């Protein structure tokens, strides 16, 4: 599909990409997270906390770390399960194909295990985002979700070798959020 998804690369974007790639190169030069497993672990915990906080998880960073370490935490059962699920998803991430719709569903199933009745399945109903009582976004109709996701993944596969990975992942994320393929957990 020509001009899908719709995006334009600006000079400002290219400057950001250049700066980020330079930082990644510097980080890789020093062997980054592989050389420092404790840094990798702490980064993962912070990432889990931040990602879940966006989804209204109320656990603090310290509580998230305690859950991951197997300690008892006082908090909502759902919040605790979200942390366990996110950690499990991180553990499995190297086993999945980033260009597979089915693997995306598998990871979603892990992320929403024991939380959502339709874990790992595309939504089968309308979806909207609200700010209080005000509808601020309406997702595409559920019947279009499988085709939209196939189009998005096909675009990624076709462009993975000729679009910078930062741009590819950013466009993917934008379109993913627009499609809102799952009932819950789209932000994780």
Please annotate each region the language model reported.
Residues 1-188:
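FIC/Doc superfamily catalytic core
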């Amino acid at each position: 599909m020509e001009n899908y998804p719709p995006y334009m690369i600006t000079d400002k974007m290219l400057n950001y990409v250049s700066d980020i790639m330079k930082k990644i190169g510097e980080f890789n030069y020093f062997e980054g997270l592989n050389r420092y497993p404790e840094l990798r672990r702490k980064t993962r915990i912070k990432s889990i906390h931040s990602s879940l906080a966006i989804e209204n998880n109320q656990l603090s960073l310290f509580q998230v770390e305690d859950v991951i370490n197997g300690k008892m935490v006082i908090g909502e059962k759902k919040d605790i399960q979200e942390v366990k699920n996110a950690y499990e998803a991180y553990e499995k991430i190297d086993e999945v194909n980033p260009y597979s719709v089915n693997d995306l569903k598998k990871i979603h199933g892990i992320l929403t295990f024991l939380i959502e009745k339709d874990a790992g399945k595309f939504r089968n109903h309308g979806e909207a985002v609200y700010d209080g009582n005000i509808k601020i976004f309406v997702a595409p109709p559920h019947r279009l979700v499988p085709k939209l996701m196939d189009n998005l993944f096909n675009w990624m596969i076709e462009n993975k070798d000729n679009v910078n990975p930062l741009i590819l992942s950013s466009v993917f994320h934008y379109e993913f959020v627009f499609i809102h393929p799952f009932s819950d957990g789209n932000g994780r």
